Amino acid sequence: MSREIRSLESIISDARENTHEKMLIRKQRDMTTDIAPERDLQGRFCSLRRIGEGTYGVVFKAIHVRDNVKCALKMIRTDRDEEGIPSTCLREISCIKDLQHDNIVTLFDIIYANSKLYMVFEFIDRDLKNLLEMLEPTNSVLPPNYVKSFMWQLLSALSYCHLRRIVHRDLKPQNILVSDSGVIKIADFGLARNFSFPSRNYTHEVVTLWYRPPEILLGSQRYSTSLDMWSLGCIFSEIASNKPLFPGECEISQLFKIFEIVGTPNIKSWPGVDSFPHYKAVFPQWPVNLKKLEETSCLTGNGLDVLREILRYPPERRLTAKGALSHRYFLQNGFTQNRPSVTDLMKDIRAQNRTPPLLNNHQEKSIF
């Protein structure tokens, strides 16, 4: 074992001591032999361009020299004096390294060099949020065949993950990549984790606010795959209407926006809801408002039925990813799994907008 790998193992073993991380750390120790030792990164990658930055590092677009393949380099800062490798990075590697699915972003390599961890992913030109933003100037929405294709691919990826007992916990348009050929890829597994049966307590600090399910907002720490399904329901509505379904400004605002459409829950509609830490008997009482759901989501017929079956409480009554794939929504009108071209769609959008393509104009910058 090389010095670099031993060093990484030392960081991992010293970085996390609390109970919730121990299983993840053990898995990561087993994985250190898969992490490449320090190499001449400058000789392996070229045409580097910074395309994003997060709490723990920076993402660069690059080209792998030998294979002439575009890739995304996620550079993770490590600090031996503080936390070392962030837990989100450990979780992402642990969850995604063995996932092989057409609709999940591929992790090509893991490189530890110069006290930094590099995760090398396949590169996709845009995310779903970028695509939806291009439609805004003309108040347009995605054509129905795109909506259905995107939803099918997302459900396929989630069904695959959930079968392997992995819950993503942070589904949102920014974490869904869209290729020119119309292929959808779920990315950013930084909050993902393996779940257990029966369910156990987990942190409730998951999922971006607009896509957070009501049980989490009410303080529940017990959840499983139904959490992802609620988020996907919100995304389904958003890609059909090009506007967020529940755009709350804070947690209580988010709850009330949900209640205004799905109805205020009670012990009859949701047995046990009164036991959640943040549940209040004095919540405003809203009835189920299917008309508002239809108007907001722009979905009708079988599409609206899928959305209704997903946005249900209690969570165990929600449609599963596997179940949704068998819904008549995907069986009507001769639906096929052929992916509509996003390149053609963007040409039409730009023609209407008369604007140049969305490009990231950051200058090339060395990361070494």
From Swiss-Prot:
Which InterPro entries does its entry note? CDK, Kinase-like_dom_sf, Prot_kinase_dom, Protein_kinase_ATP_BS, Ser/Thr_kinase_AS
Entry keyword set: ATP-binding, Cell cycle, Cell division, Developmental protein, Kinase, Magnesium, Meiosis, Metal-binding, Mitosis, Nucleotide-binding, Serine/threonine-protein kinase, Transferase
Null mutant phenotype = RNAi-mediated knockdown causes arrest at various developmental stages. The few animals reaching adulthood are sterile and have a protruding vulva. Gonads have an abnormal mitotic zone characterized by an enlargement of the distal germ cell nuclei, a reduction in the number of mitotic germ cells, a reduction in the mitotic region length and abnormal expression of gld-1. Embryos have persistent ruffling throughout the cortex and mislocalization of par-2, which remains cytoplasmic, and par-6, which remains distributed throughout the cortex.
- CDD domains with a match to the protein in the record: STKc_CDK_like (cd07829)
GO:BP terms for this protein? Answer: cell division; embryo development ending in birth or egg hatching; G1/S transition of mitotic cell cycle; germline cell cycle switching, mitotic to meiotic cell cycle; meiotic cell cycle; nematode larval development; nuclear membrane disassembly; positive regulation of G1/S transition of mitotic cell cycle
Q: Which family does it belong to?
A: Belongs to the protein kinase superfamily. CMGC Ser/Thr protein kinase family. CDC2/CDKX subfamily.
Q: What is this protein called?
A: Cyclin-dependent kinase 2
